[in-house]
Regions:
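Alpha-helical transmembrane segments
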Residues: 17-198
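Short aromatic-rich membrane-water interface segments that cap or initiate transmembrane helices
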Residues: 4-16
Length: 198
């Protein structure tokens, strides 16, 4: 079965269909987080609120998910320490190894809590990054060279001046992405709150 956030219900899903769905979500999340790692501190500051979300709900769910909460807290704490050296101008870089791990960890946590659909809101910035890249490539091929964005994924579009011509600084982009993620983490918490019977 598949849990539907905000509706607080589960719908039956066949095992083959669930396997296909899980593969799509895991691969999509891993690659989306990897795309987000294009500006100093961006992937880490966007993923930290996501991990804090999973840590908080583990406390509401009791001992059953305590180990998952410890895992999520460990990643959040590690990212906090990492960000000291990864904020602009970065001295240490995450690279594909780090961003792919974060994407895998986020997807794994969502499935371990049996709420993968929460990534629609919780991972909103990952989705925007991935969609901007897909739209850019698709539109470029369909129009033989025209672009929707100045550069993709979306954080590079902002760096290049976006649609307004105002070029965003790396620190501004990080603040925007992290802030939006925090807001949607709160929204996600509201969406699953009733599941814990509190």
């Amino acid at each position: 079965s598949l849990y539907i956030p905000f509706w607080n219900k589960t719908v039956p899903v066949s095992e083959p269909l669930y396997v296909i769905f899980a593969a799509f979500v895991i691969v999509g999340t891993v690659n989306s987080v990897n795309l987000t790692d294009g500006v100093d501190g961006l992937a880490a500051s966007t993923t930290m609120p996501v991990c804090i979300f999973f840590a908080v709900i583990s406390m509401l769910w009791g001992e059953r998910f305590l180990s998952l909460g410890v895992f999520a807290s460990g990643i959040a704490g590690g990212l906090l320490g990492f960000l000291i050296y990864n904020f602009h101008p970065a001295k240490v870089f995450m690279g594909d190894t780090g961003s792919l791990f974060l994407g895998g960890a986020v997807a794994a946590l969502a499935f371990a809590y049996d709420m993968p659909l929460i990534l629609v809101t919780l991972g909103i910035m990952y989705i925007i990054e991935a969609l901007s890249d897909i739209i850019q490539v698709g539109y470029f091929k369909l129009t033989h060279g025209k672009r929707v964005f100045k550069m993709s994924p979306f954080h590079h579009h902002l760096e290049m001046g976006g649609w307004t011509g105002h070029k965003w600084k790396e620190t501004q982009i990080v603040a925007l992405f992290a802030g939006v993620t925090v807001l949607f983490a709160v929204l996600s918490f509201i969406g699953v709150f009733h599941r814990f019977g509190v």
